[in-house]
């Protein structure tokens, strides 16, 4: 395949179309396949050759593909992206003409994937040249992919096996990757609705479902829906291929903060296994209610956490750390009160002030203590109320600090 002639290549294309062999045709138009490195196929003007062998719109599609290999050979990703848009547009015309059949879905997967990759590469080249702002090409690529998605979603006449709807999840995942990259997460919402209401949602491949759950879980995390985030990210982690250590680590980067916000702290063994020791001191700080250590841990690994987009989520752990610190204050106070036969469910606000000063919280006073306690009560982390008259926190006699998993 690396040394075939243009005529042999086009003959293989023709045969794959005639026999409706989607898998073979997908290879012949994919940049994952070795034919793209063949200098005989890297042509600046292949139109005439393609028109001699292929019917429209396949002649236009494969002429654009050969021009694309030529552009990539010259490291011109701006031109490669332009060619890839022509490939997708001409494929879409052919795909729409395939009534009640979906044999070309593998071809759609190949051209859609390459479109996203070339859009990303073109963006980088254009930004370097100062001709575009970040994400412009990706945004245009998303519009094209939405065209493919609409064709798949509107295929209501075909039976389940032959339905183009089977291609919806792959496209949604490609769109998610773009929307996360260009920071337009609100555009994910209608796509999530479409998949969740689909009667095919359990028929997609495990790999596609893992990718889908990973992105929807991340979106739920940013929306502060931590229970859904935990459910979706846990599914992605548990169903990742056993050998995909890198992918499992990627899921954990988002699953760990969610789990911690729900009160489930990771073990040091897990953090070591997936090379995520950046979370070790954060975990210890939250568990111990150690605000000083938490601030130090967040500062020490700030670059990593910001790059992963989780720094602001981890900042939310401060309220959990306050809760755990105040729970310790409550336990110590209750123990001494029982010894002195005093009321164990009333705590002086001064006790919390001392604890916060010990943790080197800056400029803290009783008003700040009341504010933190009011927040914890409002969020359900403490069952009780503040008696301003007596400057005390009055907590419930039963379960004053409910488990975090019942609160978030």
UniProtKB/Swiss-Prot annotation:
Record localization: Cytoplasm; Nucleus, Nuclear pore complex
Keyword terms of this UniProt record: Acetylation, Cytoplasm, mRNA transport, Nuclear pore complex, Nucleus, Phosphoprotein, Protein transport, Translocation, Transport
Gene responsible for this protein: PCID2
Annotated organism of origin: Bos taurus (Bovine)
Name of the protein in its database record: PCI domain-containing protein 2
One MF term in the entry's GO annotations: double-stranded DNA binding
Function (record text): Required for B-cell survival through the regulation of the expression of cell-cycle checkpoint MAD2L1 protein during B cell differentiation. As a component of the TREX-2 complex, involved in the export of mRNAs to the cytoplasm through the nuclear pores. Binds and stabilizes BRCA2 and is thus involved in the control of R-loop-associated DNA damage and transcription-associated genomic instability. Blocks the activity of the SRCAP chromatin remodeling complex by interacting with SRCAP complex member ZNHIT1 and inhibiting its interaction with the complex.
Keyword presence, Phosphoprotein: yes
Biological processes per GO annotation: negative regulation of gene expression, epigenetic; negative regulation of lymphoid progenitor cell differentiation; poly(A)+ mRNA export from nucleus; post-transcriptional tethering of RNA polymerase II gene DNA at nuclear periphery; protein transport; spleen development; transcription elongation by RNA polymerase II
Modified residues (N-acetylalanine): 2
Modification sites for Phosphoserine: 45
A single GO cellular-component term on record: nucleus
Quaternary organization: Component of the nuclear pore complex (NPC)-associated TREX-2 complex (transcription and export complex 2), composed of at least GANP, 2 copies of ENY2, PCID2, SEM1/DSS1, and either centrin CETN2 or centrin CETN3. The TREX-2 complex also associates with ALYREF/ALY and with the nucleoporin NUP153. Interacts with BRCA2. Interacts with SRCAP chromatin remodeling complex component ZNHIT1; the interaction results in inhibition of SRCAP complex activity, preventing the deposition of histone variant H2AZ1/H2A.Z to lymphoid fate regulator genes and restricting lymphoid lineage commitment.
Family: Belongs to the CSN12 family.
Residue stretches making up the PCI domain: 210-400
Entries under Pfam families matching the protein: PCI (PF01399)
